[in-house]
Amino acid sequence: MNGTLGIAFSGLAAETRRIDASASNVANARVTGALPGKGGVTEGRAPYVPVAATQGDVRTGDGQGAGVRSGVKPLSSPIVAEYDPSSSDANSQGMVGVPNVDYGAEVSQQILGSRAYSANLSVVRTTDEMTRDLLNMRT
């Protein structure tokens, strides 16, 4: 049962990371900054770069599933240009960099993460109950 708990706990950690990444994207969706110039260099304050949670499976030496590995990575097109000539970060054309956050996708990620977290928590509870029942049978 230890393997079961390890898999469930890695799932809990992965879903926590997914929800954290999405919440960070929503919280920082309007943190604008200067657009990158030539060579990708930003002069001035850089805008928030939205991230996505990544997950990959972990396997034992014999190919058995052993949980998930999670991380975060920047979105493939994290910044979009927006016209805001009043911003101190605006370039000569009045454009600033804005995080490319899709609120609908973020809500979906948060719901998915919450449901998956609950499912992993159910595995932990069930494993705990089964272990308790097994110990009670032995006494």
Annotate each language-model stretch with its function.
Residues 1-139:
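Amphipathic alpha-helical polymerization modules
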